């Protein structure tokens, strides 16, 4: 299978390593050709210190790598998802499955990121969301991690599950793409609040109170917006909330501090 990952941030790079480890013909694309050339030479990404990228991973700044791809992973920052989708659109075929791994909601439109991608690629192919408690720093060193592959089309969700699953990266499937994406976006607000708690010197009792009541609120909002209550109690919801609110790797938590 040919897989292409768009975005050389920490998460995009870690994702590309998973796919490469699984034996797929894998390409990692950067919008900056100079950065791509440097990474190809050193086999390292400064955002994932200590991780040596597989020699089999093709690192490039040429969008032509998208031709014939079976799987395309959209991994830019959330603000760049629409622009990245515009760039990928001409290369996609009906057979291609696009995986959105960025988290957030588009400013101005309030669209979920799979919706943004769908608009730009004119829904020519299926879009799946892959989300969960998955800091790139840990996936990069192959720490056991679990995520949820979500799409109303169960076949597409399982295709992504099969592409990513290995002995350190476990993938569950869900038909609730709305809930999975909302959970991944909304927990960031709570992580900021937990950072504020740390900055003010509040301890574990306070943060447990905040996280628990916040998840109840996120669940109610998510249900109103079309998500399933069950989703918010699982990996994509509570799991992601816990890791983002407590981890030393969490940028949102650090920003709150």
Model-identified regions with their sequence ranges:
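NAD(P)+-binding Rossmann beta1-loop-alpha1 motif at the extreme N-terminus of oxidoreductases
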Residues: 1-52, 58-61, 87
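Alpha-helix C-terminal capping/helix-to-coil transition sites in glycosyltransferase folds
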Residues: 65-68, 186, 238
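Internal alpha-helical scaffold of NAD(P)-dependent oxidoreductase catalytic cores
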Residues: 80, 91, 120-126, 144-192, ...
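Rossmann-like NAD(P)(H) cofactor-binding subdomain of soluble oxidoreductases
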Residues: 53, 59-144, 160
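Divalent-cation-assisted or electrostatically stabilized phosphate/pyrophosphate-binding catalytic cores
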Residues: 247-257
